[in-house]
């Protein structure tokens, strides 16, 4: 009896997030092990936002001792921790937020681990690097890229926040698009739907049945009338749709005085004309996924995602007759329970048949690849079929490509420099301060008495960076002055914001839900704006 109670308690604790990513998303989160390098203000804020929703386990890698500066900007460290292990202190306090989460720490610098035990990082589902030097992050990124482990770089520098996601390929099954259109198939009706619609006779119904007929049926009925009397094409223009709405409006029952009755289901049908008349077609992004080399040329190493995508493609070419599997859901509407459930079951049963057909194609593909039939679960199959119109594949460039002189994405920088205050300027400044660090062993402005001297040095670093990369862009001196004044500080307000944003992207990667940005995110605390760039 303890188990149901515990599950109930868990559902209560995680109720809001379960509504976002479901039980399967929560399971993925609870089985994940994330490594965070450096228990800085940014690092602990990221972990706070992973521990609270129930990440399975985390490991902090940090060889530093707690300093007064740490206590000043990190709410997870106290004055009594000064001189103690920063990794251990942060881990102990973070674990207090959620007893279900396992916290670990390693009192080593990332540089030491990269030198002596690089395979250490292979045990994690995802690695987060915070406040690392350029040379270290390049080494780490190369290692993880070759091991196919996602890396998220997160940095707070004064009033600037920076994130970079590095992941070779990230398929998203549940992208949860905003304003997704319903999959009603009124323009390409399957036989069972046509038969169900024909079972209604709006002209010979009593008032109660007439006013409780689902709006989908009403639109379908008048669509048939439109085809017979007006045109063999769906109403497309505003004028045609207004004419179609008027056709439906004429079907509202009238009382003995000739006044139209108050039939909310007909008003609902009129309101949903645009939704109902949506053309059933395969989205361009799905066509691109079907034509992707990973879909066309399957191998024994192909992950389940690509095998299922290929199975859906085979379905479209055969049973689907050019259409994706039916989603199997309909929106709530005004109708009596019996009529609504019958209509709902028509769509659900069609979705089940489509899933079974895709499953048959998947089984044949698995057999041809020499893989076990159970290597793809029923849940995976159902999930991908019901989301087949919303699939996404994100591929990020490696960090070495971004930093290479011959592979640097110069066009992306130039195209975003029309505005001299674009967030991309902040990216250029971050590259400049990293160059400053490489040359001087410290960041500009870390000592107050050197701020003025560092302005010229930082400007020189920026100029040389722009010249080396062939960037004929103008960066205002104000930014050079500002970055020197920052002194590489890590204000908690910015760190907290970046911690929330980074945790959100990490959860997207782990659950395979919602679409991650590709590939660089810059936040400006000065203007309270942000932007993403594909660098």
UniProtKB/Swiss-Prot annotation:
CDD domains: APPBP1_RUB. Pathway: Protein modification; protein neddylation. GO terms for molecular function: NEDD8 activating enzyme activity. Keywords: Ubl conjugation pathway. Residues 332-345 are annotated as: Interaction with UBA3. GO terms for biological process: protein neddylation. InterPro entries: APP-BP1 (IPR030667), ThiF/MoeB/HesA (IPR045886), ThiF_NAD_FAD-bd (IPR000594), Ubiquitin-activating_enz (IPR035985). The record marks 212 as: Interaction with UBA3. It holds the Pfam family ThiF. Heterodimer of UBA3 and NAE1. The complex binds NEDD8 and UBE2M. Belongs to the ubiquitin-activating E1 family. ULA1 subfamily. Regulatory subunit of the dimeric UBA3-NAE1 E1 enzyme. E1 activates NEDD8 by first adenylating its C-terminal glycine residue with ATP, thereafter linking this residue to the side chain of the catalytic cysteine, yielding a NEDD8-UBA3 thioester and free AMP. E1 finally transfers NEDD8 to the catalytic cysteine of UBE2M. The covalent attachment of NEDD8 to target proteins is known as 'neddylation' and the process is involved in the regulation of cell growth, viability and development. This is NEDD8-activating enzyme E1 regulatory subunit. It comes from Gallus gallus (Chicken). The gene is NAE1.
